[in-house]
Amino acid sequence: MSTPADPVVIVSFARTPMGGFQGALAGAKATELGATAVKAAIERAGVSGDLVEQIFMGCVLPAGLGQAPARQAAVGAGLPLSVEATTVNKMCGSGMQAAIMAHDALAAGSAEIIVAGGMESMTNAPYLLTKHRSGARIGHDQMMDSMYLDGLEDAYTPGKLMGAFAEDSAATYQFGREAMDAYAVAGLAKAQKAVTSGAFAAEITPVTITTRKGVETVSQDEQPLKADAAKIPTLRPAFSRDGGITAANSSSISDGAAALVMTRESVAKRLGLPIVARVVSHAAHAHEPGLFTTAPVPAMRKALAKAGWAVADVDLFEVNEAFAVVAMIAQQELGIDPDKLNVNGGACALGHPIGASGARILCTLISALQARGGKKGLASLCIGGGEATAMAVELV
């Protein structure tokens, strides 16, 4: 953890808009989205790229991107070739794990300034011919969707999607279709208000895309204003004929990136960098793969204990809505005030680019704390395979 004498701090943050599947950001690779977020975060910090020593970037679906995606993002952002780059894959927790690794490296004195974040273009995840290394020989073959295989399917029950496990947890906690839809409707309303009011302005950096029509600039989250709350109760269940989980009360397949510039407080003061927040604690939890939807609860409890905080001490919470039921479980088990949870909407409305979301919710949490006069925040994500990460931050 950060030492009281010289805590690890966040000096800037930036994220791209969240793009829909095959939507506004389809023309950009994950590494290009990552480069956009990194460049903006560096510029907002007012730090020379020559002082950045390392970069950690989450990316869950690297197939087809080429060597070292994090390195590509760093070079694309204009960072010096001397910057060491590491690509992080911890499923949906990848972006937050990048920040955790940056924190620990800074606390250990391994570096003075590190960029951490995540990036994903689920739109551009390729299909795979898994048997063609040795040749199909004869007859038909099968293509595998790398987005499903490496991102959305359970590794221990081949072919079973994450949503099927979410159905199981909804049944266990007795959250029916009506309750999950009500959560999704409320979240969509919050996200739509945030988009139209400019609440995300402190987070978002525009993305410039070259298309057949010319150069286009994407400057706001794509999906909230396209969604119709009235249609949510009419949608068919997505994972079980009689289930309650639908496309609306699940996160949507998305594209996007986010980045934070992190250092130690003493370094920030020496260089005159703006200190936005300090990292108070971080934690992780792992248990049965099929129970991944519940893993944020113990991870958050651990992070709270390390911070010396009670739930009531926290001003705002960001719990990634891989499915609405994930945040609903955390709210119920921890006794979170619903007015403090995902106040600008969550992934059900905004989208969930899996390698980026861990960094995205940190950006959103800090931005919301600033806008609402809060100070203490806690963010967490469930992770396929039965894990979760959590990070507590405090505005300075």
What are these regions (language model features)?
Residues V88-E120, A170-A199, A259-S266, Q331, ...:
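Active-site-proximal alpha-helical scaffold in enzymes
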Residues V9, R15-T16, A26-A35, R44, ...:
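N-terminal extracellular/periplasmic Venus flytrap/periplasmic-binding protein-like
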Residues D50-G58, A85-N89, I114-G118, A179-A186, ...:
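Beta-strand segments within the central parallel beta-sheet cores of soluble alpha/beta enzyme folds
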Residues C59-I113, Y156-M162, K226-S252, E333-R360, ...:
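Conserved catalytic cysteine-centered active-site region
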Residues S2-L65, P69-A77, L81-E84, F165-R177, ...:
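Conserved active-site "lid/cap" helical segment
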Residues I113-S169:
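Flexible glycine-/small-residue-enriched beta->alpha junction loops
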Residues F165-E167, F200-E203, I209-T211, V280-A349:
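Active-site pocket-lining segment
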